[in-house]
From Swiss-Prot:
Record's protein name: Two-component response regulator ARR22
Subcellular location: Nucleus
Signal peptide bounds: none
Provenance organism: Arabidopsis thaliana
Keywords of the record: Cytokinin signaling pathway, Nucleus, Phosphoprotein, Transcription, Transcription regulation, Two-component regulatory system
Functional summary from the UniProt entry: Functions as a response regulator involved in His-to-Asp phosphorelay signal transduction system. Phosphorylation of the Asp residue in the receiver domain activates the ability of the protein to promote the transcription of target genes. Type-A response regulators seem to act as negative regulators of the cytokinin signaling.
Entry similarity comment: Belongs to the ARR family. Type-A subfamily.
UniProt GO BP: cytokinin-activated signaling pathway; phosphorelay signal transduction system; regulation of DNA-templated transcription
Gene Ontology cellular-component terms listed: cytoplasm; nucleus
Record-linked CDD domains: REC_hyHK_CKI1_RcsC-like
Keyword Transcription: yes
Stored InterPro entries: CheY-like_superfamily (IPR011006), Sig_transdc_resp-reg_receiver (IPR001789), ST_Response_Regulator (IPR052048)
Higher taxonomy: Eukaryota, Viridiplantae, Streptophyta, Embryophyta, Tracheophyta
Protein modification: Two-component system major event consists of a His-to-Asp phosphorelay between a sensor histidine kinase (HK) and a response regulator (RR). In plants, the His-to-Asp phosphorelay involves an additional intermediate named Histidine-containing phosphotransfer protein (HPt). This multistep phosphorelay consists of a His-Asp-His-Asp sequential transfer of a phosphate group between first a His and an Asp of the HK protein, followed by the transfer to a conserved His of the HPt protein and finally the transfer to an Asp in the receiver domain of the RR protein.
Length: 142
């Protein structure tokens, strides 16, 4: 089931969006990736919630539980992959920034399909603070 983590008190610059901490949904079937992504978001002062697959992400939004500034979306997942999840969320009028996180970001056809589904940006694994911090700062003009 989905889990929630709040930002810590690390002495790093926090990313704020409109005077509030950035709220991130991490969608990934790999528990190690989810934990790594949670730790990265925490180190930049954000808060996060996780979903282990795309279906959980859709249910969170359908049930009205969701209000995220950013969704980090894995591409390859069981039950509902990142491309179909992104399409479904956009059909549901979800306006959150969606960033694809994939090991195949360098393959043009894979990246194109993911972007056409409604992504705002795509990052290649492994996700690091050095990759995500500048992107979030740029996307949200933080």
């Amino acid at each position: 089931m989905a889990t929630k983590s709040t930002g810590g008190t690390e002495k790093t610059k926090s990313i704020e969006v409109k005077k509030k901490l950035i709220n991130v949904l991490i969608v990934d079937d790999d528990p190690l990736n989810r934990r790594l992504h949670e730790m990265i978001i925490k180190t930049i002062g954000g808060i996060s919630q996780t979903a282990k697959n795309g279906e959980e992400a859709v249910i969170l939004h359908r049930d009205g539980e969701a209000s995220f500034d950013l969704i980090l979306m894995d591409k390859e997942m069981p039950e509902r992959d990142g491309v179909s999840t992104t399409k479904k969320l956009r059909e549901m009028k979800v306006t959150s920034m969606i960033v694809g996180v994939t090991s195949v970001a360098d393959q043009e056809e894979e990246r194109k399909a993911f972007m056409e589904a409604g992504l705002n940006h795509c990052l290649e694994k492994p996700l690091t603070k050095a990759k995500i911090f500048p992107l979030i700062s740029h996307l949200f003009d933080a």
